[in-house]
Amino acid sequence: MWGARRSSVSSSWNAASLLQLLLAALLAAGARASGEYCHGWLDAQGVWRIGFQCPERFDGGDATICCGSCALRYCCSSAEARLDQGGCDNDRQQGAGEPGRADKDGPDGSAVPIYVPFLIVGSVFVAFIILGSLVAACCCRCLRPKQDPQQSRAPGGNRLMETIPMIPSASTSRGSSSRQSSTAASSSSSANSGARAPPTRSQTNCCLPEGTMNNVYVNMPTNFSVLNCQQATQIVPHQGQYLHPPYVGYTVQHDSVPMTAVPPFMDGLQPGYRQIQSPFPHTNSEQKMYPAVTV
């Protein structure tokens, strides 16, 4: 990346130096061709003298002014000796006009102003500068590393997901619902002995469906205060998702296992629950009781 940028910068500098050399050559050529033009004239002997561009071949570079008189014209650098060619009447050839040059009295015979060559050279210089600036800007913009669009995203969209607890998948809920029957005996004994009053929750925190707070299998998460009623209703976990860890290892017996008589303390169980024998033999005659699951 940096090597490409350095190469682009060096190429831009080379292009700038080449433009400077070209402009210097143009300025030199323009300075040489920026002198006045001395029109042809008839000398004292009646011989026609062809006009020339100042400076001439043997003149200095600063001899850009047409000086002298109407009968003798030459190039010089003094503005005081400048010849007013408009006041001369011997600079028009009789018959045909000057070859390669328009007649002075014609529509195209006026002398070219001095500032025109400088104006042309300056315009070319400014055009080259503008073109070089545009090329450099385009190169820098193309070689600039692109920003990752994911970095510009605000991290505030994940705050809500951080507050929501992890909800097990459907397979976990199915497996846990099959293990609910193993805890029916212990939970029903605690429910019949004395049911505790469900904790009161303010209606401003969360709106739950009726009967949810009276269910002893639900452990309500503590992060529902940031959600509205509709979201809280959708995220209420299944009854079998929060079970006591000691009951995870028990399995469900098949229908082929002989059923035993229902003890008296299981008369108040909910419909659909039945007692399941534990696959592990008890060392004592007394039935091992587990603590009840509370909210």
Curated annotation (Swiss-Prot):
It is found in: Endoplasmic reticulum membrane. Residues 87-108, 168-205 are annotated as: Disordered. It is a single-pass type I membrane protein. Its main location: endoplasmic reticulum. Residues 169-197 have a biased composition (Low complexity). Keywords: Developmental protein, Endoplasmic reticulum, Membrane, Signal, Transmembrane, Transmembrane helix. It comes from the Eukaryota. Residues 1-33 form the signal peptide. GO terms for biological process: negative regulation of fibroblast growth factor receptor signaling pathway; negative regulation of Wnt signaling pathway. GO terms for cellular component: endoplasmic reticulum; endoplasmic reticulum membrane. Residues 34-110 are extracellular. Belongs to the shisa family. This is Protein shisa-2 homolog. The gene is SHISA2.
